[in-house]
């Protein structure tokens, strides 16, 4: 390890000084340099390239658990401890998580729904349980931009989102309309949010009722009742940013993060370290396999529900 340190620092300091500080001989260092590289060291060097590629592709968002999964997916038989060591040697550190400010405005006279979700943050199929919430970002020195998002608890897929400089019902309705257009859920969906006035508003509740969606709301002042959305916003600000130079920069960055990275590529620990889109594709494939098995055994084939569909000009296309 001392010789490795000297080799790394000899461009900054003389070998003589480094050897003297570390109490090793110059001849010993030069003899070490002349030795052929070991198989383990050569493999470490190769793996470091893959580790850094995964780290850079995630734009410095991935720590050792997800980078380890990336390597396993590439058929690299490497331990988690080795990945940690290689990252430490290369100085690769994922972005630090920050606390963020809540934006709930619950001082209103609108009716409030019961907490029907009751912290049951799992779903057996898509479009059974959605959760929604709003957070804020700092723009410039004192400006603000609000992000409203809706997440499907089955796959943690962000099905709808919207941004605005104003935190009002129009913002949350825009996110809801995106989710409804994207998913076309059947009657019976449970929609959970906090007691904020933007979700309790008559306009928002009218849309839910018209689509046969049941409303559920967290208890007042209890962020744990909507913990999955709180965690999502924390992840966004940890892996992306909590402030931007302009609204335009924020909108482009959020689109890239949510639609390109989070939904399609980001590994999720709750989903077995696969992305929301990959988890949904796997669910579709398993559902079709089960249907084929029923047909082979002589059972009648049941209609396959359009769980990830968008209706365009009378035809149904799959969306992930």
Language model feature labels by segment:
Residues 1-320:
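Charged DNA-binding/catalytic regions of mobile-element recombinases
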């Amino acid at each position: 390890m001392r010789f490795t340190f000297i080799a790394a620092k000899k461009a900054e300091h003389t070998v003589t000084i480094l050897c003297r500080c570390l109490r090793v001989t110059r001849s010993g260092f030069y003899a070490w340099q002349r030795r052929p590289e070991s198989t383990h060291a050569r493999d470490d060097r190769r793996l470091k390239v893959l580790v850094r590629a995964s780290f850079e592709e995630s734009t410095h968002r991935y720590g050792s658990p997800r980078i380890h999964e990336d390597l396993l997916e590439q058929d690299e038989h490497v331990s988690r401890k080795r990945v940690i060591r290689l990252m430490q040697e290369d100085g690769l550190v994922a972005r630090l998580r920050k606390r963020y400010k809540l934006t709930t405005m619950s001082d209103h006279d609108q009716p409030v729904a019961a907490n029907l979700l009751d912290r049951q943050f799992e779903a057996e199929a898509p479009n059974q349980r959605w959760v929604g919430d709003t957070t804020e970002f700092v723009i410039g020195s004192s400006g603000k931009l609000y992000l409203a998002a809706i997440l499907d608890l089955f796959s943690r897929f962000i099905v709808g989102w919207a941004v605005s400089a104003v935190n009002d019902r129009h913002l949350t309705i825009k996110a809801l309309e995106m989710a409804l257009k994207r998913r076309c859920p059947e009657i019976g969906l449970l929609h959970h949010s906090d007691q904020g006035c933007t979700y309790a508003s008559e306009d928002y509740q009218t849309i839910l009722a018209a689509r046969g969606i049941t409303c559920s709301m967290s208890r007042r002042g209890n962020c744990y009742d909507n913990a999955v959305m709180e965690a999502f916003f924390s992840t966004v600000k940890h892996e992306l940013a909590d402030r931007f130079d302009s609204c335009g920069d924020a909108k482009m960055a959020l689109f890239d993060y949510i639609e390109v990275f989070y939904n399609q590529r980001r590994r999720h620990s709750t989903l077995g370290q696969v992305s929301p889109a990959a988890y949904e594709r796997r669910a579709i494939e398993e559902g079709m396999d089960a249907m084929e098995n029923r047909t082979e055994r002589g059972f009648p084939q049941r209609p396959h529900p359009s769980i990830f569909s968008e209706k365009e000009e009378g035809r149904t296309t799959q969306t992930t």
